[in-house]
Amino acid sequence: MKQTFRFIKPIERITHLKPNATMMLFLASVLAVIMANSSLSTIYHEILEYPINLTIGGHEVFSHHGETMTLLQFVNDVLMVIFFLAVGLEIKQEILVGELSSFKKAMLPIVGAIGGMIVPVLFFLLVVHEGPGARGAAIPMSTDIAFALAALAVLGSRVPASLKVFLTALAVADDIGGIIVIALFYSSHINIGMLAIAFGILFIMYLMGRMHVSNLGLYFVCTFFVWLFFLQSGIHTTIAGVLAAFMIPARPGLHAKNLRAEMRSLFEAMPNDKIRQSGSSLILSHNQINVINSMRKIARKAISPMQLMEEYLSPIVGYFVLPLFAFANAGITLGGVTADALWGVPMAVFLGLFVGKPLGIYFFTYGFVKMRLCPWPEGMSRLNLMAVSLFGGIGFTVSLFIATLSYAGAEHLLFLNEAKLGIFVASIFAALVGIVTLRYELNLESAKAQKS
């Protein structure tokens, strides 16, 4: 009985977590599955087919191959650009000052990410190596960092910080690989003229950064036009979000070291005017308001446009874009999957994510360390490396996205449905086995510490 309670403790920890973006993403996915497999399925598909219109000067902005975008296309081709803009900002931060900022720091996560991209593809192709189903070989390449870190958080503060750092850096390197795959293999009929205009706008954004332009509105407007011309160029629009992110300056208008002195001088300049007060109501003088507004502007200058944009985008992506993406794309029709079909695309995706991804990350990382090409990360053992590698098999968001690109069109709907099933099952297995493995390792370490 005691063992049973010990086993369900992580589940209890999940149920006591306050609602967050990851939980909303999970709930949106569950809602999509319920609606797609109930009497609400007609309503669900009608929602996804709802047309999205925006006409400016006679030009229909949200147009997909000359036709008005449906809600599903709008989510995948427009809203996901915002997600990849946020991903690009995160990648840029890691390259500038994070775990990818030096060759020595970046080497091991990059090697692990490479293994975690190559081996899953091989496992997929072992099962489905020809025909239209093989188009989805890239599906098990990706890690969902939000769900992976949420699974890690289930075990609380006992998890070594080095594991979180390694998993985050691994996922960022993984994102870079996924972006390259999307750019190379999911673009068609490239319009060089439109692409040249898009890169011209990106160059203007670069010059704006060099000229210390910090107005986020201008960068958002430029990003919109970069997206618009990428949409017409034939290269997938998510690449526009990533490239635009790299153009956002990371240099603030005021160095943090000078912020305290600036604030002190403004604080000392605060007029000692009489404050009118009645109960909890309080009215400042105009001079006091001016000084406080100056403080606000100075404080804002101390934050770079890159970090400001990330702060703005984070809640939008977490609480709106990703849950809506999950709702639009996670609707698996379980009734349409036969027993024979399970051995095709679903098994290929499952083996790629749950077996290939962890093995690729683990053996590439461990092999690199054994060859003395890179030091073993502090606080990491072989067993918790395997646990982190299993968390890498939680694909979900980006895997679903690549599945929609791989099996686009009505003729591939069955493959898309099967791929979604494989992603769901593999991600759940990877999370559960990863949690159990890491919990076992942490308990072993705790027992050893108590004996000593």
Curated annotation (Swiss-Prot):
<feature type="transmembrane region" description="Helical">
    <location>
        <begin position="108"/>
        <end position="128"/>
    </location>
</feature>
<feature type="transmembrane region" description="Helical">
    <location>
        <begin position="316"/>
        <end position="336"/>
    </location>
</feature>
<dbReference type="InterPro" id="IPR004670">
    <property type="entry name" value="NhaA"/>
</dbReference>
<keyword id="KW-1003">Cell membrane</keyword>
<keyword id="KW-0915">Sodium</keyword>
<dbReference type="GO" id="GO:0005886">
    <property type="term" value="C:plasma membrane"/>
</dbReference>
<keyword id="KW-0997">Cell inner membrane</keyword>
<feature type="transmembrane region" description="Helical">
    <location>
        <begin position="189"/>
        <end position="209"/>
    </location>
</feature>
<dbReference type="GO" id="GO:0015385">
    <property type="term" value="F:sodium:proton antiporter activity"/>
</dbReference>
<keyword id="KW-0812">Transmembrane</keyword>
<keyword id="KW-0050">Antiport</keyword>
<feature type="transmembrane region" description="Helical">
    <location>
        <begin position="216"/>
        <end position="236"/>
    </location>
</feature>
<comment type="similarity">
    <text>Belongs to the NhaA Na(+)/H(+) (TC 2.A.33) antiporter family.</text>
</comment>
<feature type="transmembrane region" description="Helical">
    <location>
        <begin position="136"/>
        <end position="156"/>
    </location>
</feature>
<keyword id="KW-1133">Transmembrane helix</keyword>
<keyword id="KW-0472">Membrane</keyword>
<feature type="transmembrane region" description="Helical">
    <location>
        <begin position="23"/>
        <end position="43"/>
    </location>
</feature>
<feature type="transmembrane region" description="Helical">
    <location>
        <begin position="385"/>
        <end position="405"/>
    </location>
</feature>
<dbReference type="GO" id="GO:0006885">
    <property type="term" value="P:regulation of pH"/>
</dbReference>
<feature type="transmembrane region" description="Helical">
    <location>
        <begin position="349"/>
        <end position="369"/>
    </location>
</feature>
<feature type="transmembrane region" description="Helical">
    <location>
        <begin position="165"/>
        <end position="185"/>
    </location>
</feature>
<dbReference type="InterPro" id="IPR023171">
    <property type="entry name" value="Na/H_antiporter_dom_sf"/>
</dbReference>
<protein>
    <recommendedName>
        <fullName>Na(+)/H(+) antiporter NhaA</fullName>
    </recommendedName>
</protein>
<comment type="function">
    <text>Na(+)/H(+) antiporter that extrudes sodium in exchange for external protons.</text>
</comment>
<keyword id="KW-0739">Sodium transport</keyword>
<keyword id="KW-0813">Transport</keyword>
<keyword id="KW-0406">Ion transport</keyword>
<feature type="transmembrane region" description="Helical">
    <location>
        <begin position="71"/>
        <end position="91"/>
    </location>
</feature>
<feature type="transmembrane region" description="Helical">
    <location>
        <begin position="418"/>
        <end position="438"/>
    </location>
</feature>
<dbReference type="Pfam" id="PF06965">
    <property type="entry name" value="Na_H_antiport_1"/>
</dbReference>
